[in-house]
């Protein structure tokens, strides 16, 4: 989307920036959570927030923070220096495909699995949900300054780009279907 690209490039000056998104996760007391987060976000450090279902927003405008609405993660994540998210399978996959390091803050279900996998693969870290607003600043600094994590994220994206996930999924479904017909 050309309009998204224009808005982000004007805001970022062409630099990669941290991106915060919680996808379909919603929170109780979102305003209070965001206030805790903004109180600890490093002064002068730019950030892109995708509002998502959580309705992440600012109580007042901040020149260093851009809040955007619905947009494809595949479009958005290429502008990221680090992706801060909940660890949903789709968001994790999009960040892996984009070749960007991740900070995962899992909330429930398989999000803990994806956080462990990203950490095991060396392309990101996990922060515990309870204190994430207070810990996010140092975590972003750590991940952005980790040459190893950046390189591993790029390496994983290169591997994923050689795979044809759709074709493989169709093949597996066809095999499963034909096995069920033979029963």
Model-derived features: positions:
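A donor-sugar binding/catalytic signature common to diverse glycosyltransferases
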Residues: 68-117
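C-terminal amphipathic helix plus adjacent low-complexity
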Residues: 134-183
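Short amphipathic alpha-helical segments
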Residues: 31-34, 60-61, 95-98, 115-117, ...
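Donor-nucleotide binding loops and adjacent catalytic segments primarily
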Residues: 1-82
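Short hydrophobic alpha-helical runs that function as membrane-insertion/retention elements
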Residues: 47-49, 103-104, 125-127
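Short, surface-exposed connector motifs at secondary-structure boundaries
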Residues: 16-18, 96-101, 152
């Amino acid at each position: 989307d050309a309009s998204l690209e224009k808005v982000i490039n004007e805001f970022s000056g062409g630099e990669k920036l941290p991106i915060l998104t919680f996808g379909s996760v919603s929170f109780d007391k979102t305003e209070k959570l965001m206030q805790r987060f903004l109180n600890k976000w490093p002064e002068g450090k730019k950030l892109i927030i995708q509002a998502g279902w959580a309705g992440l927003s600012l109580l007042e405008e901040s020149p260093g923070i851009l809040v955007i609405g619905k947009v494809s993660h595949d479009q958005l994540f290429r502008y990221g220096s680090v992706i801060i998210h909940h660890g949903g399978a789709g968001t994790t996959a999009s960040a892996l495909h984009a070749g960007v390091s991740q900070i995962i803050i899992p909330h429930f279900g398989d999000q803990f699995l994806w956080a462990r996998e990203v950490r095991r693969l060396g392309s990101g870290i996990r922060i515990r949900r309870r204190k994430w607003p207070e810990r996010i600043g140092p975590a972003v600094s750590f991940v952005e300054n980790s040459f190893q994590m950046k390189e591993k994220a790029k390496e994983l994206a290169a591997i994923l780009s050689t795979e044809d996930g759709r074709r493989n999924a169709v093949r597996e479904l066809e095999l499963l279907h034909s096995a069920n017909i033979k029963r």
